[in-house]
Amino acid sequence: MAFTEITPERAWDMIQTENAVLLDVRDAERFSYSRAQGAFHLTNQSYGEFQDTYDFDHPVIVSCYHGISSRSIAAFLAEQGYDNVYSVIGGFEGWQRAGLPMETAYGVKPI
């Protein structure tokens, strides 16, 4: 099993058109401060909820800080049987640089 690396723009397109889920694997403090709009915070504690909510054929996109550790998580999810797994190139930093929608502690920041 493998995963595919995609741009933040492609990730946003997949979220909108393919109902893909974006998994943010950063620490809780950073996630609560700012995140990609609609992101699911994937942790050891929330993994069961993720498994219960999303089938193996659901498109799954993983994002971290810089696009490095998301590759390991994407590979793990593919090994677990998820068929459509992607990693965001540049991670959350890339998402911000692309000017894509975000949620912050202060509300939603639109495009």
UniProtKB/Swiss-Prot annotation:
Keywords: Cytoplasm, Transferase. Pfam families: Rhodanese. GO terms for molecular function: thiosulfate-cyanide sulfurtransferase activity. SMART domains: RHOD. PROSITE patterns: RHODANESE_3. GO terms for biological process: glycerol metabolic process. GO terms for cellular component: cytoplasm. It is an enzyme of class 2 (transferase). Its EC number is 2.8.1.1. The keyword Membrane does not apply. The active site is at C64. It catalyses: thiosulfate + hydrogen cyanide = thiocyanate + sulfite + 2 H(+); thiosulfate + [thioredoxin]-dithiol = [thioredoxin]-disulfide + hydrogen sulfide + sulfite + 2 H(+). InterPro entries: GlpE_sulfurtransferase, Rhodanese-like_dom, Rhodanese-like_dom_sf, Thiosulf_sulfurTrfase. Residues 16-104 form the Rhodanese domain. It is found in: Cytoplasm. It comes from the Bacteria. Belongs to the GlpE family. Transferase that catalyzes the transfer of sulfur from thiosulfate to thiophilic acceptors such as cyanide or dithiols. May function in a CysM-independent thiosulfate assimilation pathway by catalyzing the conversion of thiosulfate to sulfite, which can then be used for L-cysteine biosynthesis. This is Thiosulfate sulfurtransferase GlpE.
